[in-house]
Amino acid sequence: MKDFTTYLSTAPVVAAAWFTFTAGLLIEINRFFPDPLAFSF
């Protein structure tokens, strides 16, 4: 189990998790606000 937690804390795994989270966040923002450039303030 110690080796598995060491593997999960390596840079490629952390980067992949962070990129997946960021991509999902951007997709959901674009789903609820489809074209933010069209907003007129």
Swiss-Prot record:
- Please give one Pfam family short name: PSI_PsaJ
Q: Where the protein is mainly located, per its record? A: plastid
Membrane-crossing segments per the record? 7-27
Asked whether the keyword rRNA-binding is assigned, the reply is no
Location comes to: Plastid, Chloroplast thylakoid membrane
Q: How does this chain sit within the bilayer? A: Single-pass membrane protein
For this UniProt entry, what's an example GO CC term?
chloroplast thylakoid membrane
Protein name per the record: Photosystem I reaction center subunit IX
- Say which species the protein is native to: Oltmannsiellopsis viridis (Marine flagellate)
Gene behind this chain?
A: psaJ
